[in-house]
Amino acid sequence: MMTPENDEEQTSVFSATVYGDKIQGKNKRKRVIGLCIRISMVISLLSMITMSAFLIVRLNQCMSANKAAITDSAVAVAAASSTHRKVVSSTTQYDHKESCNGLYYQGSCYILHSDYKSFEDAKANCAAESSTLPNKSDVLTTWLIDYVEDTWGSDGNPITKTTSDYQDSDVSQEVRKYFCT
């Protein structure tokens, strides 16, 4: 064995031996911590991939359900919309179902008559059905304006999104489609 010649060499040899043991312990801890970090990263990646696949499947289910709901509602609105009204009297209660073969908006049914008629004929036809021509002010700021545009209004002028000079002219000879409400 090596014998140090002075105290300084003796301390340095001794401390190097202790330091070597500490390095081996630190290396083991670093390896264990590094392994734990790698394992946790792999688990995180796997869970993220699994969640992404799950969310993609759910998104496809929601989109197909939404597409079916939009299609069903469009068919229902186009075919007929109906409302349920309860009529309550003092003795009995009745369920009254009112159907609308047209556009339903805020309790009113807008039925399109695609035959072209003059204002007077359209007004008389709506009166025979116990209804009236729509007011421009009622439909101008709603989604209905896209449907009732260029049809007869209750004031005798065509319903349009914009006002122009021709609306004040004589429209007695014109024929248009019309809605009854």
From Swiss-Prot:
Residue ranges that the UniProt entry lists as topological domain Intravirion: 1-34
Residue ranges annotated as Virion surface topological domain: 58-181
TM regions (residue ranges): 35-57
Keywords: Disulfide bond, Glycoprotein, Host membrane, Membrane, Signal-anchor, Transmembrane, Transmembrane helix, Virion
Primary residence: virion
UniProt-annotated glycosylation sites, renumbered to this chain: 135
InterPro entries attached to this UniProt entry: C-type_lectin-like/link_sf (IPR016186), Chordopox_A33R (IPR009238), CTDL_fold (IPR016187)
Family: Belongs to the orthopoxvirus OPG161 family.
Protein name (record): Protein OPG161
Organism: Monkeypox virus
Gene designation per UniProt: OPG161
